[in-house]
Every structure is written in C-alpha cells, then in structure tokens.
C-alpha cells in the first residue's frame, strides 16, 4: 500500500461507509429484500443493515472477498443469477462505472427487482471531472484488482439510460459529503450522486 492509499484507508474509507449508509438507508422500502450488486467487503451493506434491521441484504460480486461482512455469492459480471422479481430493491454502489456495459446490469436489475433500484455512481460533468474520477478510482480500487475501465457518464447520459430501460427517477441526492473539508472541494463537488429508480409495476 503506497502512502496515498494508506491515507485513504485511514481517513476516507470509514467515513465513506458511514456517510453512504446514512444516505442510503432511508431509501429502501420497509422490510425489503435487497440485492447489493458489487458488494465488495460488504461494509456499506452491513452499516445499512444496522440502521435498517428490517432489511434482508444479500451480496453479489465477481470477486468474493474473504473479509466480506455479508453473505456474498459470485456472479459472472453480466447476468444476475436470480429469477424475475426475486428482490424488492437492487443496490449498486460505485459499480456500474467498473463495467464495460452498464446497460446490461441495469436491465438485469430491472428484471430481478420488483420495486426499486438504488444507484450510487458518478457524474462526469464539470471541471476536470474525468481525471479526478480516474485518480480517485485508482487510489480506492487498484490494489484490490478491481477492473478500472473508467466508464464514467454525465448525468444527461445516465438520465437517457434510465428512460431507455423504463425506469422512473423518483429522487436524486447530490453533495453527499463523503469527503471532509478541504478534500470535499476537490473530490465531492457534484461528482457523486444517489438516484432512486422506480421499477414500473
């Protein structure tokens, strides 16, 4: 681990888990069965579960880690190995920009989810957005052998995808406060969002 990665591990990672869990927890339906796609170490899902003990959260990832905090199954990165309408909600936290085709997984989430998709990802709009996001991704993920295709979209592109796939955007959270000041001025800005996508009945 290089010095920058050590700083990230010590000062950013725990805060990110706390902040995102607090932002995400209120967004799920009551007593929902949730699929966390790309769940990684499971710390965010675990923290959401502490805030929302009514939820039943299952993890899914292409790389199942030995330190995963929630029950996690392996998948091929393309097809979600569940029947239609298995889950009330599907969660993606900083996952889709690691895929070559985010449409594929959003379509699969629409299939296996009954009510909503909760998506945390990046908005590549803004001053030096792309190099900033690439650098953040390298620091946070490279040492875990996570794929880094840097497939970042602008909000207008996300909105077009959601419409194309039949989702309704029920809400969008921005300025999430993941980073402390002064890092927030560089790495937060409007680069992050959480979208609540409703799956039509």
Model-derived features: positions:
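Short catalytic micro-motifs in class I SAM-dependent methyltransferases
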Residues: 94-95
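A conserved beta-strand element that flanks and buttresses the S-adenosyl-L-methionine
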Residues: 91
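A short glycine-rich, Lys/Arg-flanked "PGG" loop and its adjoining helix->strand segment in the class I
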Residues: 103-117
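Core SAM-dependent methyltransferase catalytic element
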Residues: 180-201
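Class I SAM-dependent methyltransferase Rossmann-like catalytic core
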Residues: 1-20
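Class I SAM-dependent methyltransferase SAM/SAH-binding core
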Residues: 41-79
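C-terminal alpha-helical "lid/dimerization" subdomain adjacent to the S-adenosyl-L-methionine
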Residues: 46, 122-182
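Conserved class I S-adenosyl-L-methionine
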Residues: 31-40
